[in-house]
Structure formats: C-alpha cells, structure tokens
C-alpha cells in the first residue's frame, strides 16, 4: 500500500465515524503548494463555507501559500465564514493527514476564530 492509499484509507475511516455522529465537518486538504478548508453540512451534500490559499484575498495576505502562516489565514477565514452562516460546532476532518504542522495550525486558528471542535 502506497502513501496516498494509506492516507485515503485513514480519511475514509474517519469520515465514516463523523457521518455516524451526524455532525457538520471542517474538512482540510493540503498540497505542497496550497491549503484548502471546507465546512460541509452533516448530510454531505452542501458546502456551507470554504477558504483556500488559491483565493486572491488570502494569497495577498501571505508571503507563500504552502506554509503554516498560510494555513492560519485559511483557518481564520473559513471559521469567520462558517460563523456568518450560523455554524459554531463542527467535527474536524483532517482527511487522513497527520495532525501536525499546517493541519494543526489551521485547526488552532479556526478555534481561535470561534469554531468549536
């Protein structure tokens, strides 16, 4: 099993558990160059809020889009957008990525901005 298949297996297992809870989830995806975050409704069919380093507003705030500072900016932005829509409690879906570095930084900044998980 290669690295990507292992990550997808971990992500699938976590998503199944979150689906059983029936919770709105904060999904994180990272690539070497960008960080993406979405708040997805409990039914899985609606994206309530989203933010990424691809967006011009966030890209202008940071020096480089693939580092911890960029992840913090994305976490803050997605949390503010979710709170505007009335979402305060989410389950954190790290998409099989290790809770470390950019993933942890995004989670911490989303918590500081007001999301609870």
Curated annotation (Swiss-Prot):
| PANTHER family membership | 39S RIBOSOMAL PROTEIN L18, MITOCHONDRIAL, LARGE RIBOSOMAL SUBUNIT PROTEIN UL18M
Report the leader peptide range: none
Highest taxon above the source species:
Bacteria
What is the designated name of this protein? Large ribosomal subunit protein uL18
Task: Write the record's keywords in alphabetical order, separated by commas.
Answer: Ribonucleoprotein, Ribosomal protein, RNA-binding, rRNA-binding
Record's Gene Ontology CC terms? cytosolic large ribosomal subunit
Q: Does the keyword Glycoprotein apply?
A: no
Q: How does it assemble?
A: Part of the 50S ribosomal subunit; part of the 5S rRNA/L5/L18/L25 subcomplex. Contacts the 5S and 23S rRNAs.
**What is the role of the protein in this entry?**
This is one of the proteins that bind and probably mediate the attachment of the 5S RNA into the large ribosomal subunit, where it forms part of the central protuberance.
Q: Which GO terms describe its biological process?
A: translation
- Could you tell me one molecular function GO term of this UniProt entry? 5S rRNA binding
Homology family: Belongs to the universal ribosomal protein uL18 family.
Read off the Gene3D superfamilies from this record.
3.30.420.100
Q: State the organism of origin.
A: Vibrio cholerae serotype O1 (strain ATCC 39315 / El Tor Inaba N16961)
């Amino acid at each position: 099993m290669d690295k990507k298949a292992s990550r997808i297996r971990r992500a699938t297992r976590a998503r199944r558990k979150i689906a059983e809870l029936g919770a709105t989830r904060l999904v994180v995806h990272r690539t070497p160059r960008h960080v993406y975050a979405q708040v997805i409704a409990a039914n899985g069919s609606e994206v309530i809020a989203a933010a990424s380093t691809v967006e011009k507003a966030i890209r202008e705030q940071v020096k480089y889009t693939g580092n911890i500072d960029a992840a913090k900016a994305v976490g803050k932005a997605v949390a503010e957008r979710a709170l505007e829509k009335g979402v305060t409690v989410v389950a954190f879906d790290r998409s099989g990525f290790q809770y470390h570095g950019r993933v942890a930084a995004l989670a911490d900044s989303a918590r500081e901005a007001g999301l609870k998980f």
